Amino acid sequence: MVTNGGETIALSALEHQNDGASSTVYYTKEISPEAMTSIYAALGQEVTGEKIAVKLSTGEPPASNYLDPNLIKDLVQQVNGTIVECNTAYGGQRANTAMHYQVAKDHGFTDIADFVVLDEDGSVSLPVNGGEQLTENLVGAHFPEYDGYLVLSHFKGHAMAGMGGAIKNISIGLGSQEGKCLIHTAGKSHDSPWGGEQDPFTESMAEAGKSVVDSLDGNILFISVMNHLSVDCDCNGNPAQPDMHDIGILASADPVALDQACVDLVYASQDDTASLIQRMESRNAIHVVEHGERIGLGSRSYRLENLDA
């Protein structure tokens, strides 16, 4: 049992928690720079190589809920990481490379690390093995220049996907502008993100995510922060105010298990989670982890390690 904001969550009762599961998700209710470095250490492995990328969302101005640079600074500098992101495909202040660099500066990310827009020079294709919707995934052209990726995600709702977590961060988040269009339309359009069907879209996210993990041969780790739990994504510059308290930080080597654990925690919270649950259910958000498990991206069952116990 953990208590956050006066609300109690029974960790042992999380729907997909299984002590015999092969995937482990680490959890702490503390949200602090120290907790970020501690949960990374708890993983028992590190992203390795000379060049490490830290993937996150830079956040759409003026008031999105992107991760606070002060929260992640120590961890980013510990791994000597370069913060990376890709341009958006739907307009806004991050659809243009020069403007995106300015947003990263304005939001404080360039104060803590180097920053690179991965698709400022276009796309590179990654093969999608075993995909039902995609045969290729177009990521930023500079994606292959990094040996390992540390993926820092802010878990929250999303207007189109229903939720945004680790899988979204490595699929839509690492997709070039052209790649984002392919994912949104399940491979039908290279130049427009609009008009796709919902389940093929979320299946494409899982398939694009798997292509990223496959290309890195597992040299990728995931940390998700469950704070500012709005129904809206950080691509929304004016998100709805959260109805619920912050939950904590989770980490795993398995993005499917990590996203599933975040969903389970939302459902298990005794807080007012109705708006976020409605957003997820109205978009069939859970389908991204269902498909992710089916294609071998990860497992929905996980063993939860409570670092506060």
Positions of the model-derived regions?
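Universal eukaryotic N-terminal targeting presequences
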Residues: 1-3
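Extended, low-polarity segments enriched in aliphatic/aromatic residues
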Residues: 6, 14-309
